[in-house]
Amino acid sequence: MDAKKMFVALVLIATFALPSLATFEKDFITPETIQAILKKSAPLSNIMLEEDVINALLKSKTVISNPIIEEAFLKNSNGLNGIPCGESCVWIPCISAAIGCSCKSKVCYRNSLDN
């Protein structure tokens, strides 16, 4: 009987806990940042190039909705780093460097005075 309970507990952990823990290991990026990078890097490119870029981003970073990120930035930012670019740089450098962002305190920011 105890072996059955342990097996059920193991299956539940493997089903629900492990996938959510895996998402914390990845950096994130917003759909708006992806669009800004695509417009800046290849404005006249074909759709295939855009799909390749988006696939590469999805494999390296987790796409997350903008309101969630904005709320987290407002709570944790003191406003001195610049404007958040909608991307983290904990493990992977800022892909949004193409639009003038740089990594500060594990978040990609754009300094409006540098532009």
From Swiss-Prot:
Propeptide cleavage-removed residue intervals: 23-81, 112-115
A Pfam family of this chain: Cyclotide
PTM annotation, UniProt: Cycloviolacin-O13 is a cyclic peptide.
GO biological process, one term: defense response
Membrane-crossing residue ranges in chain numbering: none
UniProt crosslink position (Cyclopeptide (Gly-Asn)): 82-111
Signal sequence, renumbered to the chain: 1-22
Keyword terms, alphabetized: Cytolysis, Disulfide bond, Hemolysis, Knottin, Plant defense, Signal
Recorded superkingdom: Eukaryota
Expression across tissues: Expressed in leaves, petals, petioles, roots and runners (at protein level).
Disulfide bonds: 85-101, 89-103, 94-108
Matches recorded under PROSITE patterns: CYCLOTIDE, CYCLOTIDE_BRACELET
Protein family according to the UniProt entry: Belongs to the cyclotide family. Bracelet subfamily.
Domain notes: The presence of a 'disulfide through disulfide knot' structurally defines this protein as a knottin.
Function statement: Probably participates in a plant defense mechanism. Has hemolytic activity.
Name this polypeptide is given: Cycloviolacin-O13
Organism: Viola odorata (Sweet violet)
